[in-house]
């Protein structure tokens, strides 16, 4: 897995005002469903959708990678984009606080991204 994709995803999230962008390196944790999670939150449904759409567009444009599966765009309380080795959850702020995905993998190496 190339770190370029994580940077492209983080930049795409930040371009559309994603908040608290954090990636988790799950490779050392043998039970994880992917190598990386990169998560953020936003304050509104339109913002969640805009972030997810921008991630998809930037990954095609800069990494030549299409999303394998998308879930959650119907109600957009959260949207998950699956790229196989990378899972990209985008939450509305209260849902991120409720699900606390980062706490599931507290041992994972974390990287925070900022503008």
Listing of model-derived features with the role each one plays in the protein:
Residues 81-83:
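Active-site beta-strand termini and strand-to-loop segments that position acidic
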Residues 97-100:
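Switch/connector loops and helix/strand junctions flanking conserved nucleotide-binding motifs
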């Amino acid at each position: 897995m190339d770190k370029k994709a994580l940077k492209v995803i983080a930049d795409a999230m930040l371009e559309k005002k994603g908040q608290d962008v954090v990636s988790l390196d799950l490779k050392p944790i043998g039970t994880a469903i992917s190598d990386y999670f990169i998560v953020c939150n936003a304050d509104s449904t339109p913002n969640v959708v805009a972030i997810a759409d921008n991630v998809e567009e930037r990954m095609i444009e800069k990494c030549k990678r299409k999303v394998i599966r998308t879930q959650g765009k119907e109600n957009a309380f959260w949207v998950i984009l699956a790229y196989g080795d990378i899972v990209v959850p985008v939450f509305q702020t209260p849902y991120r606080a409720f699900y606390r995905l980062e706490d599931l993998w507290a041992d994972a190496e974390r990287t925070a991204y900022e503008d």
